[in-house]
UniProtKB/Swiss-Prot annotation:
PANTHER family to which the protein is assigned, alphabetical: ADENOSYLHOMOCYSTEINASE
Cofactor details (free text): Binds 1 NAD(+) per subunit.
Annotated binding of NAD(+), by residue: 165-167, 199, 228-233, 251, 286, 307-309, 352
Cofactor: NAD(+)
UniProt function note: May play a key role in the regulation of the intracellular concentration of adenosylhomocysteine.
Subcellular location field: Cytoplasm
Pathway assigned in UniProt: Amino-acid biosynthesis; L-homocysteine biosynthesis; L-homocysteine from S-adenosyl-L-homocysteine: step 1/1
Domain of life: Bacteria
Family: Belongs to the adenosylhomocysteinase family.
Gene behind the chain: ahcY
Pfam families linked: AdoHcyase (PF05221), AdoHcyase_NAD (PF00670)
Secretion signal, residue range per the UniProt entry: none
GO CC aspect terms: cytosol
UniProt-recorded name of the protein: Adenosylhomocysteinase
Organism: Coxiella burnetii (strain CbuK_Q154) (Coxiella burnetii (strain Q154))
């Protein structure tokens, strides 16, 4: 496979696993388009205006079928793109092949090494004939950090970055505080139609899908610990309970802990549950959540996985000297000196993309419609965005939701003038204040 990829690199402006998967990828892209009404509506609305004409976007998001629909939407709106994946295991090779076959510069394949991962990101920042980006589209912050640290000369021409996920947003705010952020950023993650849909409903479906594909384990009757009760943790806990698991939550935030308790979950500590739970899921965006000491206490055949962005929530490094037995791609048994076995999924990286195909197309349409609108905002209205971290305005958040209602058979009630005046809003919205918590 590696030889095939190197040959492709020398002859084409892409680096993927297998171009022969392109037809399969194209069929799945066409199916996904029917489930992504937000992106298709933007194509229809802007196909003639081309609001991204002149934009050169370097993108770093999981190279999935749904991302392919996003990329082709950006291009139909006038942009040029170069793309890599933000995770070494998350690429769907048939999706990458379908885009590469159309001449789109894609640098991603499932199972990259760390070195190859960073080489792919670097490839998105430099193209033929002096091509460099003037916009970034990121997931997790690696592309942004790499640009700032390794290519500071590019920053003066970059109008901004739109960031997809919680982890990347945390990094942006840290960069802003430290003074190292050199261009504006739009925090797509905190759009309501992203965090309350992708993070919650997406994880509610994709976590179970990945655990089932990886292990074939019966969820019902199992004791499962979900570490973190933010939107991602909430979605995971809901699906696990729906399948019949007894769910325990660990939390640092008293508000989230109280929410979990009021939903009927037991709020516990890892130290308390390490020796008795069957499945452990980390969903915190933090580091050292499951330590080596915790794993020493776990029982034989316990399953350990992560649905946070990076691989540092579980101390995988501490297991490297033990015997690893690969069961199938991204599923390993780690055998401890005493003979105990732990099932480690996706080497502690994003389990829903390492062991399955990620979130369904419909919920990703929400997220990616926000991404397109953020890119248009940064490109069309740079004067509105000095260096800082912003969220999309409320009226655009509501518009994203509106574009998806028909697909689920939902009909809106329309305010009368009297009703709108009574609560002090425009009949067309926005309907909630900026600080409203959905």
């Amino acid at each position: 496979m590696e030889n095939d990829m190197e040959t492709a690199t020398m002859t084409q402006d892409y680096h993927i696993a297998n171009i022969n998967l392109a037809d399969w990828g194209r069929k799945e892209i066409e199916i996904a388009e029917t489930e992504m009404p937000g992106l298709m509506a933007l194509r229809k609305k802007y196909k003639n205006a081309k609001p991204l004409k002149g934009a050169r976007i370097a993108g770093c998001i999981h190279m999935t079928i749904q991302t392919a629909v996003l990329i082709e939407t950006l291009m139909l709106l006038g942009a040029e793109v170069r793309w890599s994946s933000c995770n070494i295991f998350s690429t769907q090779d048939h999706a990458a092949a379908a885009l590469a076959q159309k001449g789109i510069p894609i640098f991603a394949w499932k199972g990259e090494t760390e070195e190859e991962y960073w080489r792919c990101i670097a490839s998105t920042l430099e193209g033929p004939k002096g091509w460099t980006p003037n916009l970034l589209l990121d997931d997790g912050g690696d592309l942004t950090a790499h640009t700032l640290q390794k290519h500071p000369e590019l920053c003066q021409n970059i109008r901004g970055v739109s960031e997809e996920t919680t982890t990347g947003v945390h990094r942006l705010y840290r960069m802003l505080k430290e003074g190292s952020l050199k261009f504006p950023a739009i925090n797509v993650n905190d759009s309501v139609t992203k965090s309350k849909f992708d993070n919650l409903y997406g994880c509610r479906e994709s976590l179970i899908d990945s655990i089932k594909r990886a292990t074939d384990v019966m969820i019902a009757g199992k004791r499962v610990v979900v570490c973190g009760y933010g939107d991602v943790g909430k979605g995971c806990a809901q699906s696990l309970r729906a399948y019949g698991a007894t769910v325990y939550i660990t939390e640092i935030d008293p508000i989230c802990a109280l929410q979990a308790a009021m939903e009927g979950y037991r709020v516990v500590t890892m130290d308390e549950m390490a020796d008795s739970a069957d499945i452990f899921v980390t969903a915190t965006g933090n580091t050292d959540i499951i330590t080596h000491e915790h794993m020493l206490k776990m029982k034989d055949q316990a399953i350990v996985c992560n649905i946070g962005h990076f691989d540092n929530e579980i101390d995988i490094a501490s297991l490297q000297d033990y015997q690893w037995m690969n069961i199938k791609p991204q599923v390993d048994q780690v055998i401890f000196p005493d003979g105990k076995r732990l099932m480690v999924l996706a080497q502690g990286r994003l389990v829903n993309l390492g062991c399955a195909t990620g979130h369904p197309s419909f919920v990703m349409s929400n997220s990616f419609t926000n991404q397109v609108l953020a890119q248009i905002e940064l490109w069309q209205y740079p004067e509105k965005y000095p260096i800082g971290v912003y969220v999309l305005p409320k009226h655009l958040d509501e518009e994203v939701a509106r574009l998806h209602l028909e697909r689920v058979g939902a009909k809106l009630t329309t305010l009368t003038e009297k009703q709108a005046d009574y609560i002090g809003v425009d009949p067309e919205g926005p309907f909630k204040s900026e600080h409203y918590r959905y």
